[in-house]
Amino acid sequence: MTEHPTKITRRGLMLASAGLASLASAFARAATPPATAASPANGPFTLPALPYAENALDPVISSTTMGFHYGKHHKGYVDNLNKAVTGTPLASMSLEEIITSTYGQADKTAIYNNASQDWNHSFYWKSLRADGGGTPPAALKQKIDASFGDMAGLRKEMLAAATSQFGSGWAWLVLDGDKLAVTKTGNADSPLTRGQKPLLTIDVWEHAYYLDYQNRRADYAAAVFDKLANWGFAADNLKA
């Protein structure tokens, strides 16, 4: 049987080109993903979606760090918490209720640690935004000036808390009574157990920065405060 060469018409070529262009456009959209989707739950708690793509905070925090930090570490806390509370009365509680009710109980240390780390990380992701930093909204800025003198005063205290925390932990801007304060917590601990309202946090566990900054925690903390701090989120927490 004799094969005849396919005749390519001008119209066919135009349609094929249009199809390839459409495919390329779809591929380009897929290559720059939007905010991540929440992971399916294997228990009462779900790994929440990131509020941005994993590469959104580059170059301050790399997509490699975000992939490990969010996809491995944070997910691990959620998975471990689900394993620990499924089938118990704690499964029907909120994270905040679990944190405050298990704090200081030796037989529930693992539950407390995983619940608090889940909460802390979810709060940390929201404390960051691409093109962050700068001047906070007016009401928050007024409160900062009253408590720290100015933004430079707040920056000094936040970086001091972040760099002086021995080992793993967190630096926090909190509302303590009617004044703002900076505090730090070790390991999984949270201001929630102290009756303080968290407004913003910087994670100073090594897994938050070591791939990008090695042992230069001070550089990481300064870059987060100056370039990623989500002051709109902090202002919303102040009003809540």
Question: Residue ranges of each PLM-predicted region?
Answer:
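N-terminal secretory signal peptides and thylakoid transit peptides that target proteins
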Residues: 2-21
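Short helix-capping/linker segments at secondary-structure and domain boundaries
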Residues: 24, 28, 126-136, 214-217
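C-terminal segment of N-terminal export signals and the immediately downstream linker at the start
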Residues: 27-61
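All-alpha RGS (Regulator of G-protein Signaling) helical domain and cognate RGS-like helical scaffolds
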Residues: 40-44, 71-78, 82-184
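Soluble non-cytosolic domains of exported or imported proteins
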Residues: 60, 64, 68-75, 228
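Hydrophobic/aromatic-rich, well-ordered segments within soluble, folded domains that form packed cores
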Residues: 69-75, 119-122, 200-211
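An amphipathic alpha-helical core segment
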Residues: 160-215, 223-232
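Low-complexity, Gly/Ser/Thr/Pro-rich intrinsically disordered linker/tail segments
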Residues: 232-240
